[in-house]
Amino acid sequence: MPKIVVVGAVAGGATCASQIRRLDKESDIIIFEKDRDMSFANCALPYVIGEVVEDRRYALAYTPEEFYDRKQITVKTYHEVIAINDERQTVSVLNRKTNEQFEESYDKLILSPGASANSLGFESDITFTLRNLEDTDAIDQFIKANQVDKVLVVGAGYVSLEVLENLYERGLHPTLIHRSDKINKLMDADMNQPILDELDKREIPYRLNEEINAINGNEITFKSGKVEHYDMIIEGVGTHPNSKFIESSNIKLDRKGFIPVNDKFETNVPNIYAIGDIATSHYRHVDLPASVPLAWGAHRAASIVAEQIAGNDTIEFKGFLGNNIVKFFDYTFASVGVKPNELKQFDYKMVEVTQGAHANYYPGNSPLHLRVYYDTSNRQILRAAAVGKEGADKRIDVLSMAMMNQLTVDELTEFEVAYAPPYSHPKDLINMIGYKAK
């Protein structure tokens, strides 16, 4: 009976194991998870903190016991894989509760250890990061136990923005700082102004080009010279792949610690796959490498690996498009395609339109800003971005499908919109992009 070992039990690992079991009823499947919880919804965590998700249990799909009862898959939490011997096809495992170590053999090894939150490195009892359900519980319990009011949020990426919004909605008083003036880097810089407008509208303090110099109890000294007091600090300063344990093996890592994979999510070592935040692959629509540590990619990779292990040799990954979205108070920010800083590798043109998300005479209309970049050599779409209170998600998803099928910007005129006054225009913003490009 083949033995399949999975490292990591969240989006990629748990999904892959589940899909393998759906296709293969016989194999022995074991998942090692270094932390307390398995199969939780990472993207739900800020909303648990904000009490938008009313019960944290809604963010937890399975316990190990439930997973075994439903799928006959063994999940061992607090078990950290600390080394791989790919020549003997074994992994070394540390039981973090007992501090005991043991070896586990495998026929197939699936690596989905995810990433960990970066830290600024200050020794402080009021400083937290958010990466898993344990972090979420710690933040929630600290807020309740210490009657937290003033919270400093460090960083201005997706997670920090979501955390700040949810702290505000919970009734706390957050302040945002960021070390540069470049916020929300997945979005075009000049399309981020509504973020600052939303902060100003709610009188939420923020400072760009600001950093922490020192923390002394609740007293924070900043690079600017300001000294302020906060009850709590939440750091959202990026992540790094959990790949240290892989260095002992023959598995190739890139300079940032990610694992390059082929179109089957195979590593350079036979019988070892890598999926989720740790894997780096390529874009679908252009010839560039891509690392897209988001939920869709982890789930797609899980299905592809499961199909292969079950015997489907023809299935392949065709690449990322990098579709991403975030809600910040009343606005939605969405984009798809290459990152803004990757556009310089192409000879491109940009076309954009700003108009109401639906018919102007229908109540509740608000402006939607849609922008498309296309390659001048073949007029295919490289990147699209949208910002507005309504309809950004729909337009970016349509453009994602257009890019998946390598449509040109001119072909957007042929997009047949589902039109009624509450939803769109007879000539949608997507159509208008095509017309303007001509």
From Swiss-Prot:
Keywords: FAD, Flavoprotein, NADP, Oxidoreductase, Redox-active center. It catalyses: NADP(+) + 2 CoA = CoA-disulfide + NADPH + H(+). The active site is at C43 (nucleophile), C43 (redox-active). One of its GO terms (molecular function) is flavin adenine dinucleotide binding. Its EC number is 1.8.1.14. Its cofactor is FAD. Pfam families: Pyr_redox_2, Pyr_redox_dim. Substrate binds at T15, Q19, R22, S39, N42, K71, H299, K427. NADP(+) binds at residues 151-166. The keyword Flavoprotein applies. Binds 1 FAD per subunit. Catalyzes specifically the NADPH-dependent reduction of coenzyme A disulfide. Homodimer. Contains 2 FAD binding domains and a single NADPH binding domain. This is Coenzyme A disulfide reductase. It comes from Staphylococcus aureus (strain COL). The gene is cdr.
